[in-house]
């Protein structure tokens, strides 16, 4: 059974939208399965890539993303939150890091017969380790434990 977020992520990948799954879904893909309310993605911030993203989002849920434009995706910290079947947070910069900075720190998973990139444990730890959020601290601890288990 495909979840709504799996369908959307596969759709974005098929359309050649350049993105990396970050946040709770990436933590789960690295082996620490936990619930998460949203899906976080970091996108490459070129106008062409954002246009592909927006084209694919027009059919997402009720289609509220049709109201977005390329200008809504600024090169600054913070996410554009799109709430449809689930909340989707779209970042162009996350903790000072851009898509180009993190693409080398990704792994690939197969969703609906298409490869989708997600952030590896080391990079996730780097993004989350200075966070004040309790969930981020739990994630860092769990990811470090998983890394320690894998290295022994």
Residue ranges and their predicted role:
Residues 1-152:
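Compositionally biased terminal segments of proteins
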């Amino acid at each position: 059974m495909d979840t709504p977020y799996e369908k959307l992520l596969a759709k974005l990948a098929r359309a050649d939208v350049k993105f990396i799954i970050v946040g709770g879904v990436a933590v789960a893909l690295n082996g620490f399965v936990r619930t998460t309310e949203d899906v976080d993605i970091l996108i490459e911030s070129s106008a062409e890539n954002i246009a592909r993203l927006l084209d694919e989002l027009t059919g997402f849920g009720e289609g509220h993303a049709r109201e977005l434009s390329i200008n809504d995706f600024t090169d600054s910290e913070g996410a554009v939150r799109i709430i449809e079947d689930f909340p989707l947070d779209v970042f162009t910069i996350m903790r000072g890091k851009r898509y180009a900075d993190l693409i080398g720190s990704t792994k690939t998973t197969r969703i609906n017969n298409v490869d989708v990139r997600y952030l590896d444990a080391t990079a996730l730890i780097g993004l989350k380790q200075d966070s004040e959020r309790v969930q981020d601290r739990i994630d860092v601890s769990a990811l470090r434990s998983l890394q320690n288990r894998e290295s022994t």
